[in-house]
């Protein structure tokens, strides 16, 4: 199976089921080629208690993609909010573990589990 690592990144933003929750759902590879829209999204998002980054639709992430995820986490924390990643594939989890990002960013197995952290 050949994985497209330079395709477009789709970003969908919606309110979660739990009040005060924002869900950012990504679909496509998260790479240097397409991180800029996600960076802008993190900078412009509302101040809510919980931001959930749904990576279920992300087949591949490079170091630049990981960097923008960490920056999103830092941005949320700086405003007093929580940041949780869900749908982290084994491939992306391996990247997070290798760089110790898994010790910094909270992860949940499902969207419902992440919303319970609000």
PLM regions: where:
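Amphipathic alpha-helical interaction surfaces in cytosolic regulatory modules
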Residues: 29-105
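STAS-typified acidic loop motif
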Residues: 3-40
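Short acidic-hydrophobic, aromatic-tinged amphipathic segments that line or gate anion-handling sites
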Residues: 106-110
């Amino acid at each position: 199976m050949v994985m497209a690592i330079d395709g477009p990144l789709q970003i969908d933003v919606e309110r979660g089921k739990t009040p005060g929750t924002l869900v950012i759902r990504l679909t496509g590879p998260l790479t240097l080629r397409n991180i800029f829209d996600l960076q802008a999204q993190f900078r412009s998002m509302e101040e809510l208690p919980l931001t959930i980054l749904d990576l279920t639709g992300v087949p591949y992430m490079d170091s630049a993609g990981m960097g923008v995820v960490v920056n999103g986490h830092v941005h949320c924390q700086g405003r007093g909010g929580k940041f949780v990643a869900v749908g982290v594939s084994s491939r992306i989890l391996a990247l997070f573990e290798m760089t110790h990002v898994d010790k910094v960013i909270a992860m949940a197995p499902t969207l419902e589990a992440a919303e319970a952290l609000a």
